[in-house]
Amino acid sequence: MDARLLIPDNVSEVLVKIIRFTELRRRILHQNLHHVDQPGFTPRDLPVREFAEVLSEAVAEHLRSHRLLFRDTATITFGPNNTMQIQPVADSRARSLLRTDRDEYMELQVNKLLENSLNRKIAQELLRHQCGVCPGMTDGDINETVAGDNSSTDSSPHLDAAE
């Protein structure tokens, strides 16, 4: 028997990270919609490009050495028990639009939410396929599987404090 068959595929771990990231980003984007009338409000987002680069590097490392290694960055930190903390960043483009063209600002936020939702749905479907989960499994079931016992450990203290 091939010993590699006993090692779980790291694709599932990457998909779980994507699902967690998209949930955290959804919260931030919702704040951007709900707090537009707050004086001095600064729209934020999660560092999407940075997160994609971290995942690309982890997958490249996996292909080279058969181990999945997530490296911390200035705004993304990986911890024990599969946790990650992400520092939201100010969204200067959104801030500018909020000041000059509120309709464009709202459209930007809605488009980001739609893109984020699509990314989440794709990752969930791939995870279902990867893990052999039955097609009838609901999003709630996936969320329970992904979040574990303490989903708040997947966000940064800065993100939690902002909510």
Q: What is each of the regions a protein language model found here?
A:
Residues 1-163:
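Amphipathic alpha-helical polymerization modules
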